[in-house]
Design a protein with these regions (language model features):
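Zn-dependent metallo-beta-lactamase
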Residues: 1-24
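Rieske [2Fe-2S] iron-sulfur-binding domain
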Residues: 17, 21-110
Length: 110
């Protein structure tokens, strides 16, 4: 059973492997990625100069690299590779090939 706090985003097949997609959920800018069949949801706003470009980043070593200045964030939790706070991450559920995320009004880590 799915909690009412989850929002329906898209079908898994709507995502391209390794390519981010941008969504606005409850006024939160989200970057969604599918890597090896697993789906990850992170804040789309980089803490460095607040660029909303994370969805355009490339994937390297289970991290997304911000295209603006090269900061790396772990896909699983949004933390910076060097241990900094990084990006907010959001719970994802896939039910019958539909992706749902729980994006609540979280303050940014920066």
């Amino acid at each position: 059973m799915l909690s009412e706090n989850f929002s329906k985003l898209c079908r898994v097949e709507d995502l391209t492997e390794g390519i981010g997609k941008r969504f606005l959920v409850n006024e939160i800018d989200i970057a969604l990625f599918k890597i090896k069949g697993e789906v990850f949801a992170l804040s789309n706003v980089c803490p460095h100069q607040h660029s909303a470009l994370i969805y355009e980043g490339f994937i390297e070593d289970n991290c997304v690299v911000c295209p603006a200045h090269g900061w790396k964030f772990k896909l699983k939790d949004g933390k910076m590779e060097n241990g900094g706070n990084g990006l907010n991450s959001y719970p994802v559920k896939v039910i019958d090939d539909i992706i749902y995320i729980k994006a609540e009004d979280k303050s940014n880590n920066w």
